Amino acid sequence: MAYSYTEKKRIRKDFGKLPDVMEVPYLLAIQLDSYRKFTQADTPFDQRKDMGLHAAFKSIFPIVSYSGNAALEYVSYALGKPVFDVKECVLRGATYAVPLRVKVRLIIYDKDSSSKAIKDIKEQEVYMGEIPLMTDNGTFVVNGTERVIVSQLHRSPGVFFEHDKGKTHSSGKLLYSARVIPYRGSWLDFEFDPKDLVFVRIDRRRKLPASILLRALGYTTEQMLDMFYETSKFGLTETGECVLELVPSRLRGDVTTFEIKDKDGNLIVEDGRRITARHIRQLEKAGVTELSVPHEYMVGRALAKDIINAESGEVLFECNTEITDEVLAELVKSGVKEFETLYTNELDCGPFISDTLRSDPARTQLEALVEIYRMMRPGEPPTKESAETLFQNLFFSSERYDLSAVGRMKFNRRLGRDSEVGSGTLSNEDIVDVLKTLIDIRNGKGVVDDIDHLGNRRVRSVGEMAENQFRVGLVRVERAVKERLSMAESEGLMPQDLINAKPVAAAVKEFFGSSQLSQFMDQNNPLSEVTHKRRVSALGPGGLTRERAGFEVRDVHPTHYGRVCPIETPEGPNIGLINSLATYARTNSYGFLESPHRKVVDGKVTDEIEYLSAINEAKFVIAQASAAQNENGELTEELVSVRFQNEFTLKGPSEVQYMDVSPRQVVSVAASLIPFLEHDDANRALMGSNMQRQAVPTLKAQKPLVGTGMERNVAADSGVCVVAKRGGVIERVDAARIVVRVADDEVEAGEAGVDIYNLTKYTRSNQNTCINQRSIVRTGEKVSRGDILADGPSVDLGELALGQNMRIAFMPWNGYNFEDSILVSERVVQEDRFTTIHIQELTCIARDTKLGSEEITADIPNVGEGALSKLDESGIVYVGAEVASGDILVGKVTPKGETQLTPEEKLLRAIFGEKASDVKDTSLRVPSSVKGTVIDVQVFTRDGLEKDQRSRDIEKAQLDQIRKDLNEEYRIVQGATFERLRAALVGNTAMTGKGVVKGQPVTDEMLDELSHDDWFKIRMNDDVLNEQIDAAEVALAERRKELDDRFEDKKGKLETGDDLAPGVLKIVKVYLAIKRRIQPGDKMAGRHGNKGVISVIMPVEDMPYDENGNPIDIVLNPLGVPSRMNVGQVLEMHLGLAAKSLGEKIDEMLKQQKAVAEIRQFLDQIYNQIGESYKAEELDTFSDDEIIELANNLRDGVPMATRAFDGAKEKEIKQLLTLGGMPDSGQMTLFDGRTGDPFQRPTTVGYMYMLKLNHLVDDKMHARSTGSYSLVTQQPLGGKAQFGGQRFGEMEVWALEAYGAAYTLQEMLTVKSDDVAGRTKMYKNIVDGDHRMEPGMPESFNVLVKEIRSLGINIELEQDN
């Protein structure tokens, strides 16, 4: 295998026994692919598929006017270029979007001619608002903040059959129902009630008998009975005897009420016996086809057809009439020879439709339509037309109703039809088939659906949701356009006069800005970004709500396997409603999640990979990825553990049809980053996956010694690193950019052979953590496409690095690690292991007020020199200034209202022209409890206002940077061009030119003495070479011009003013970098759900140490392991100890300058001789220098990868411990740092990867003396943001009462809270050094009095004089 640039520098030892069949797919594909399908930006408009924007336009257009004389047709659309790039949008608070222009055609028809003759056609491009663009990392920048649109898991359109689980009726009877869910349109429900009648509901309104709907569709009673029932035929003799045409199989299970005999009079079934299969066989053998039945047998049956009097033609009895003795007598009297009844029985053919028809008030189609109209629009008088139109629009109009391709596919599959395509609206057959299937299920044929099955839930991603919103906007436009179209002809309007783009723009903006699924991106670290984009939520518009979601929806379903992670989901009210995609899962064209599988043929595993959705998966027998196989890929076990029909069973190898591709395909990205996941309890693994997302990037990222091999994928796909777009050689590297000269074979004709990567330096993330990129390449090194050139936050040499490897011991230590507390050594603080940088953005806005405009200035009234020392002449703080709470960052003054002046003041004003008192100081100050360094200042000025000195300086610095970049690019292109020219010219004969001799070959020395301009003047003997020289000159000139144009464009953007909100003159943004060291109260965690709060930081000399004098960094409580069942952390510690000790061995060898061969041999022993990994590391392909570099990178430990469900075994860990010279128990004797005595027994010591979580004590704790008070109760406000007090609540009062601490209690409830006079007096007293208090009346008592009075009860306080 080929190693990438970073892999070569540090190889991770992999314990995996199973080969990698398939690379982990690109992790953000679900977002990018979905939005690409929506915009289809790179597809020429004649090749665009019917999806996304294109489909939305096609579904609304053409719009025809009411008169039909004018129509507006859609031709195509084009997306423009974004004005600002992503970084500029974030800085300016703009939305990263492109203008959408739609080409439409207005056609006007001739009114007079009978056939529609076209009178006029106008075509025009119309602006339809802005469409937000997705960045390369799958996010959107909306108003300057990065947002993510989370995919939604919703119920697939189609038809579903279910029952109420016996909850509706007290008897516990199962009531079945069917529901047709369209993609958009009205829901149609059929349901049984406890009396076994069938009802229909439309849009969950009042229920009507189901026969009303069928009648409205145009079916008569007779047709309905014919559709749902078979009939029994009877003959009537003159004497009134009934003869049944016998179908023997129908009798099975009935109890006879009379004897059944054959033709010869032999008894076959006695009276009162149940007819069995044996009886039926006897009847068939005897050839009995007719049976004379008594009248009692007939009573209670229903007629299947209308019975008509042959002579008069009148209807004697309507169909569905129940037969009684009177009816029979009438039939005999009328001379009816034969009639048919409905065949029903108790077992598998109930009389549901027949009974429903009897309860149906409607008799004709019109009555049924009116009944439906009344239910849908109560209170409106129905007319025939309105009732027909309403019903037609409900399910049969493509404008109002759409099942969608998915819905039609699910609908047809569920009803057992062959075709998967069809119309988007319902047909009569569709409705009847749903009802038939429902009745079959009630009759015991067929089963209900499982709505939590992933074959019945589909994923709606960004593109689809954006398309729906866009369509909503277009529908609003359509109404307006229809009305204007009638005027189009008379007033000669153009298409752009007809279309108002505002509704479309508003709908799109609303979706991206404030939809429940458009979320502020979680940007704590690269993993949290990736996880956020791969999240699948069941909440949101058209989804579930937290309160209504029951237990079943939240539970893990067998179909989640390989599609949705069973581990990663939030704790709390959203548990199970928000899920994460499994590592290998993707969505198919219908939006169902599918998972990859290897095909197995005749017990032999092939390399062919097929994706199966949950719908298809159940049919197949699927083996686990870990199933044992030999070299030829044949399954070796006699019985293989397989999944079949969503159950886990055992089958023989020949029956296996598919096999999983990887053991980690079950879990999500975050869970696959937990080493030894298979040894952790699921609840703790859930916490582990969730807490990794909260890890704050540390100052120096450090790769995990014990990882899982997924770290590389996450770092590369997250988009926080700089990845080489094309291979080449590193031309230059500095802190802010990397310049790559692209390899010749990757340069396309006529483009620059240079890639410049500007690094992001110290910028703020959404969570106020620090985003910083550091280059890891050196000048002159070769890189290939896809290599990582610079590490982002929490990335170390191209691997995700969320925390630090700490030396840990499991032991109690004087109660300091009681209940998950963590004891930390001071060394951790000194080495800045968990020091993090947080960046805060503070904004100062100067507005136009009624009294005049605010001004940003250094001239602030009543402020001393000291406070202004950090401001420049514009009143803005210097970059690099260290500021603490209360310091002024931006000086700002606001005009004050004119107050009435005394005559004396007026006189002074008149004499001295004193004007300073009419402004007040509203400067931006550093908030309380914040201390940091100013790292950046941005000034935005409204267009048309003069910029201050500071903005001009910032602008100049930015322009210099751009100019420098462009010059660099030109220099490299120029260098490459002249290199190619030199190669072409040297050794060939010259004709004319400066410094060349005619007829002599050109040499390197000749060229070196010429200036570059003179090179172009050389003429050669060979015309081909002359053309090459000319082409090079033209190409360089063009490049220069292009770069100048680019510079002018950027300059123009910088120099124009900014588009600020109305009334805003200037915005100053100050960025503060705050350094947070670790301290007691901060929350830390491992990757196995083992979290805790730091209780104390102990000096190094007090910490326990081993025989070599190495102190422990962190002491954890051993009682945190057994009850939590996350043993993975213990294994991680053992393997970490082995990794570290091997690193120390390598370090020793390097210090002793051992031969390279010896080091190579030791590395080979580590990588290739311990464990049964499926792949050997090819150390022979490394040069000696590369081996030394690799060894140098392994000095602080050899990184290991132990994958989920395919990790290191105990034996392998012991071998590595032994190789590193450690006891294979992983335990050692420790000594007490304070006394020097050894502890009683050996202690488990090792290295664990610890994370510092974004729950820092600095953000949570504050102290207040005096501050703001609530308006009504006059009690101090609560919360850190309001600088509030500590609540002394009900239970705390009880505690003081229990102690009888009366004075303390009085103080708490009066002067420390809401006794206004008392607290002011107290403040004065303390200032005077007098510590007495005089409690008065608490304000809340007055509030109570007022509330009682508001109830109409007079209450007064009597005071003793």
Swiss-Prot record:
Q: Which GO terms describe its biological process?
A: DNA-templated transcription
Q: Which GO terms describe its cellular component?
A: DNA-directed RNA polymerase complex
Catalyses:
RNA(n) + a ribonucleoside 5'-triphosphate = RNA(n+1) + diphosphate
What class does this enzyme belong to in the EC scheme?
transferase
> Per UniProt, which keywords does this protein have?
DNA-directed RNA polymerase, Nucleotidyltransferase, Transcription, Transferase
Q: Which residues form the signal peptide?
A: none
Entries under InterPro entries matching the protein: DNA-dir_RNA_pol_bsu_ext_1_sf, DNA-dir_RNA_pol_bsu_external_1, DNA-dir_RNA_pol_su2, DNA-dir_RNAP_su2_dom, DNA-dir_RNAP_su2_hyb_sf, RNA_pol_bsu_bac, RNA_pol_bsu_CS, RNA_pol_bsu_protrusion
**Record keywords: Repressor included?**
no
At the top level, the lineage of the source is: Bacteria
Q: What are the EC numbers?
A: 2.7.7.6
Q: Name one GO molecular function term.
A: ribonucleoside binding
Q: How does it assemble?
A: The RNAP catalytic core consists of 2 alpha, 1 beta, 1 beta' and 1 omega subunit. When a sigma factor is associated with the core the holoenzyme is formed, which can initiate transcription.
Xref: NCBIfam families: PRK00405.1, rpoB
Question: What protein family does this chain belong to?
Answer: Belongs to the RNA polymerase beta chain family.
Described by its record, this protein's role is as follows: DNA-dependent RNA polymerase catalyzes the transcription of DNA into RNA using the four ribonucleoside triphosphates as substrates.
PANTHER family per record: DNA-DIRECTED RNA POLYMERASE I SUBUNIT 2
Quote the HAMAP family the UniProt record gives: RNApol_bact_RpoB
Would you tell me the protein name for this molecule? DNA-directed RNA polymerase subunit beta
Question: What is the gene called?
Answer: rpoB
